[in-house]
Amino acid sequence: MAWAPLLLTLLSLLTGSLSQPVLTQPPSASASLGASVTLTCTLSSGYSNYKVDWYQQRPGKGPRFVMRVGTGGIVGSKGDGIPDRFSVLGSGLNRYLTIKNIQEEDESDYHCGADHGSGSNFV
């Protein structure tokens, strides 16, 4: 029976490494030109320390990295060409992307994704 504690330890380590965060994002948001909008990406319970990447995807184009956000705000730097009107904030399980003074070129789909070491989840 000496193997039982070892087996339980291995199972708990494997279970922890295979678990993945689930991300949820409201289906849509809209705002007028010149206004501001805040988009929310929510991590599943137990993943409050995870960082989330925000991406912008214009019709017919591939995703473009906007910036990474953790509980302390931006992590690293913004993606190439992302204006200062874009900002992020992290609080608890929520990761926010705010766009101020919305311009026509901001009209896009915005997705969030979390890298959990064994792959990535996107919504």
Curated annotation (Swiss-Prot):
Region (Complementarity-determining-2): 69-76
Membrane spanning stretches: none
Region (Framework-3): 77-112
Region span, Framework-1: 20-44
Key words of the record: Adaptive immunity, Cell membrane, Disulfide bond, Immunity, Immunoglobulin, Immunoglobulin domain, Membrane, Phosphoprotein, Secreted, Signal
Domain annotation Ig-like: ranges: 21-123
In-chain residues carrying the UniProt-annotated modification Phosphothreonine: 98
InterPro entries the UniProt entry points to: Ig-like_dom, Ig-like_dom_sf, Ig-like_fold, Ig_sub, Ig_sub2, Ig_V-set, IgV_Light_Chain
Modification type Phosphotyrosine: residues: 96
Listed GO CC annotations: extracellular region; immunoglobulin complex; plasma membrane
Pfam families: V-set
Subcellular location per the Swiss-Prot or TrEMBL entry: Secreted; Cell membrane
Signal peptide range in chain numbering: 1-19
Location of the region described as Complementarity-determining-1 in the Swiss-Prot/TrEMBL record: 45-51
Annotated disulfide bonds: 41-112
Gene3D superfamilies xref list: Immunoglobulins
One of the protein's GO biological processes: immune response
Chain segments carrying region Framework-2: 52-68
Quaternary structure annotation from Swiss-Prot or TrEMBL: Immunoglobulins are composed of two identical heavy chains and two identical light chains; disulfide-linked.
Protein name: Immunoglobulin lambda variable 9-49
Organism classification: Eukaryota, Metazoa, Chordata, Craniata, Vertebrata
Gene (name only): IGLV9-49
